Amino acid sequence: MDITNPPIAIGSHLLMLGTSDYPIYLVKDGGEAAVFEGGVSACGPVLERQITALGVACELVKQIVVTHGHPDHVMAVPAFRKMFPGAPVLASQIAAATMGNEKAIGFFTKIDGALTAWLVGKGAITESEKAPAFTELKILVDRVLKEGDTIRVGGLSFDVIATPGHSDCSLSFFEPVRKIAIVADVTGFYMPATKTWWPMYFTDYTACLASTRRLAALGAEVVCLAHNAVITGADDVKKYFEGAIASIEAYHKRIVDAVKAGKDGRALAGELGAEIHAKTGSLPLDFFQKNCSLLIKNSLRHEGIHVEKPA
């Protein structure tokens, strides 16, 4: 089952909050809670409104967990710090370095502004839920996470799993008793209405495929995605991962076949970027075309094919 409309409780230990486009997950057990995902800046005011309405006490939140250091996954962290005083921020070493880089966060604020305007325009948030401008271009991390670490929330214990491929800093988290997996972006941008994916192996095709297969083998029964949905039920989770893996492989094949047939890399990036832009439109066309150029580069590198770098 695809769950797409927060705020909603998913079992007794998990709340899907934030917006459908940028969900925030609140895990709770034994009188304490943790927030997973750092969202766009508007997720701060949205989350505050939601937890107030749900009667969740801010002092219960003891940890703020970042899945990876991209602008749509870290920009609400400063608001979360204020909302949950004393709660440490957890992220990978690479994500921590990015989040502490003023130049990177300065760029992120521009992306965040565009995403905020898009959310307002589509009615996902109100004007009053636009976050104030950043006063400091750094987002500090208190605890660095790595493969094999554990995050404890009451009696729940989440295994930290390095899942590179979308980014080198991507982490996923799995609670084996409740069978909850929080998987960030590595499995692709899933569109529940059509049950299709836009693969996002922005750093490495092979690693992305391996990470997705590793997550598929966990036996999760609840999969919390970085965008658009939570997948519940063992059978639907199995189908989700099968679809994600097939989508990654098919997109890769499409790229390789097109280039081998003589398609210019720049033209292909333009075509692929226009396709996904038409489906989401969250950022300007050239943003998606540049990201598709990364997918082309990584697919061709995997095949050992050298061509002119697509622009």
Feature annotation, model-predicted:
Residues S41-C43, G69-V74, A96-T98, S167-S170, ...:
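Active-site environment of divalent metal-dependent phosphoester hydrolases
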Residues R254-A311:
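C-terminal regulatory/interaction regions
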Residues P192-F202:
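Surface-exposed cleft-lining segments at the edges of enzyme active sites
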Residues F36-G39, L60-H68, L90-S92, A162-G165, ...:
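Active-site neighborhood of phospho(di)ester-bond hydrolases with catalytic His/Asp-centered motifs
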Residues L26-V27, V144-E175, I180:
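Core dinuclear metal-dependent hydrolase active-site scaffold
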Residues T52-T150, A250:
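Active-site HxH/HxHxD metal-binding segment of metal-dependent hydrolases
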Residues I3-L54, S172-D185:
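Conserved beta-strand hairpin/beta-sheet module of binuclear metal-dependent hydrolase folds
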